[in-house]
Every structure is written in C-alpha cells, then in structure tokens.
Amino acid sequence: GDRLSLIDDETKEPLPAAVLPFLGKTLLQGLIEDVQAREYLYFKLRGRKIITNIAIMTSHEKQNHRRILELFERAGWFGRPKESFFFFSQPLVPVINTEGKWCFEENERLFLKPGGHGVLWKLAQQQGVFDWFQKKGVQKALVRQVNNPVAGCDYGLLALAGIGLSRNKTFGSAACPRLVGSQEGTSVVRERIRKGGFSYSLAPIEYCVFKEHGVIDESEEEGGVYSKYPSNTNILFVDLPAIRRAINKSPIPGMLVNPKRAVYFDGDGQKREGRIARLECTMQNISEQMESTFSGRLEGSSLTEMSSFLTYNQRRKTISCTKRKYGGDGLFLETPEGAFLDVLNNAYELLTRCNCKVPKPRSPKLFFERGPSFLFFYLSALGPLFSIIAQKLKGGKLLWGSELDLHIADVELENVTIKGSVLLHAEDENKGAAQLSNAMFVNEGIDFRAPNLYWKKEIQYKERFEIILEGAGFFVAEDVHFRGGGRIIVPDGMRLIAQEKRGELFFIKEKRDPFSGNWHYTFTDHAKIELSKLTKS
C-alpha cells in the first residue's frame, strides 16, 4: 500500500493494499465475494454447496502478514471454514543503488522490499501449499491479485477456468487491450526449433525489457491508443502438477532489475535520493517452461493446440488496478478513482443489457467536478454473469443522479423506476429474496453538495429508501409507489407484501414457505444458463 498512502488512523502505521476500502468493503472482501459468487452459481445449477480452497501469499513488509490475518479474524473468516485458507509469505530482498552498493534505512538496517510475485511457485512448493491442495484433491487453480477489483466481472474468470479445464491446459492468462506506453508487460508466442520438430510456449515480456526482446510498442491502428501487443495480466489458470514440474526447471522465473527513484541511506549513514533496484521476478514467466512440441510448425488457429492459452476480453472487465493514490492530474490509470470509473462503465453496459433506461456515465472530468450521472452497486452473486443478471432485472428506469444498491442474489426487478436512492440488502445473501414489479421510488437521494467519496462508497444522502431482509426474509411489491425516504425491515422467515390502494401503502405479513424463492437455474442445450420462475413465491 505504499503508493496508496494507506495509514492506520490510530497507530499511523502503513497498511497493506488488501484493506483499501473500495465500493464499501475492503479489496480482500471483494475478492472473497467473487469466489462466493461462483460457489452460489454452482449451487444453483447443481444443487450442491462447495467451498473453494484459497491460498493467500502475503508479505512481512510493514507487518502486512499480521494485518491480513487480523483482518480475517475480525471478519470471522468471511463466514468460511478457517481450514479452507492457507497463508504463506514472500521473502524480502535487499535493495542496491546503481553502483551496486547496499541501501539502508535510517536505522542502519538493510533496505528490504518484496522480491516480486515470481517467488509464488517456489514458495508454494517449499511451504506446503501444493501438498495442501493435493490432499484436498485440487489439481487446477486460478491466480489473481487483490488490487484488481474488476477481475471477477461478468464471464472473465469463468471463461479462463472453463477453457483451461475443458481442454486440459497447463497454463492460461487473461489478456486485454494494452495502452501504448503503459507500464504493463505483454505475452508473445515463443517458437523454438527442436530436434525433430518445433516447441511452443507463452513468453511474457515486462515493459522495461521490451527493447531487449525487439518489441516495438506501437498502436494497433494508426493514431490509436491501444498497442498491437495485449496486456499480460496477473490473472492466471494453472495446472498444479505441471507447475511443480516447471519449478524444477525454473524455480524463480522472470528475474529482472527495474530501477526506480527513491530515498535511502548509504553505508555511511548519509541520506540520498537516486535510482535503486532489487532483483524482482514475475509469476507469469513460469509459462516459458510449459512447452508443447510438434513435428511441424504451428500457424494461425493451430496455435490453440498449445498447452498454454490466452483469453482476450474488454480491458475494463479484465484489469483496473488500485496501485497508487490519485494525484489530481487527470491520470486515472492504476488509481482507485480510475477503477471506479471502469466499474461505472461496466454497470452502464449491464443495465443497458437489462433494457433499463439509464443515463450515460459522465466523463472523468465532469464526474469529479459534479458527481455521477447514476450509481449502481451489486453483489457478485447476483450474477456474476451479465446474462444471468439480465434475466433478474428487466426494464425500468434509473433517473439522472439516482442510485440502486443491490446486496442480494435472489431478486426479480421488473419495470422498477428510481428517482433518488434505493438500497435492497439481504443480510444473508443465500436466503434473502425480493420481488418487485411496476414499483416506483421517489426520494431526495444523494446529497451532491456533500464531500462524497464515491469509489469508497462514502456517500451522504438527503433521503434514501432501504429494504433490509433479515435471514430468510422475502419482500414483495407490485404496482406500488414509495414516496420519500424510509426503511422496511423484513424479519427472518417472513414474507412481507407491500400493496397500494387509493394512494395508501399497507403491508401483509405472512410466514414464508421455506422452499420459496425466485429462480431455478438450468443449462440449455447451447450451454447457456437459463433462469425460470419457481412455482412457489
């Protein structure tokens, strides 16, 4: 969290990036919710609950490892079994200056920094992560970094895992368009002539060594902003036995030295500022050891026969990192503000697909001067596929400056109009349900004059209407007009029906059928997921 300037309010100590508040929760909680969304999807399709085993690599820099464990403890392990997590920590490596001399901190200790995520594989082997997965029967895994909150959007992770599993691949990476001149690496196919044939592998190349590898970073189209080389993200699919074999050939892949300016102390205790560097390594480069050998040369579509693969998706659905604090310079790349703008654009695409009338997102400049044209937040388990959400949300309007916040998975909204702000919150995401049809909410909504931090979801309201579902609460409203702010709480196990007669609201409370809900999920003959209404509601 260095570049994010994350500081503990009480101790004034630096905090890890995983605790950055984004969309009203930490980045770590957002990642866990993405995992739970896929588990919920599996449950709805197969009728069986599963728990995904998660290994987390931390760092001892600035007590990050301890703080991550404390976060899990405070969060009650996010409602998951403690034994479904495995923590291991990457080592710190010494820093040198351009003269090759050691750099020190003010206390005369060596200046140490994490040595890069390429140590992931060797550490996983040494600290028992692979053995832990093997005992649990896990052969394949997805890898992602906590500072990329859009990675779980729509179908990206499911497609990556689906291709890897269905075609028994050993390595895969999620690629997307890459801005010319950006500090992002790329991946190319490396061909080697072997005795009796040709071998192929994916070769990631970091941006700082493009010239050494003959990579000319130019736009795909004349005058375009995107490079002809895609971005090689840290969203990976891996075959664990294949990774273990690859470690024997390259235990620390992608080693490089990338100098950066910083303040340090020399061996005589003198404070200096200059270019310093550490030996880094990159986890994607393990793919260079995943070679596929063929008797003839591969070209075009035949390259899909390789054991490694890339998926290619929209950038705003693949990578939008929260690496640094926004400096007010209009450069949003790798900032929380930039990631939030991508989240809004994804939300606009989603709501448009739902045939919901919604204002277009404002330009970044207008957004930060005047606020958003709309806000839409939702729980990952609502989908996560846009094609699923579009079957739950149908039609309706989200008027200018309005907000809809859906912290719920089992919901049906049909022709719902919102002028103001509405929160629909299920305290138990797996049990709470709601069904609204031809409903209208009108209230004062967001206070746009307040110092709102939208990307943190720190928003002040003039009025807001909230529907809170306790446990297995079920809320139903049809042909109802909700005027002004307010809060409705539906008790656990109850079904609350809102009705309107002659302009007056009244409510009917009854016991909820424990088997009731909104949706039944099935696969169609064309491998699409189709939702049908349950008979009991």
Model-predicted segments: where are they?
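Domain-scale recognition of functional cores that engage charged ligands
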Residues: G1-Q284
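Left-handed beta-helix
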Residues: L160-S537
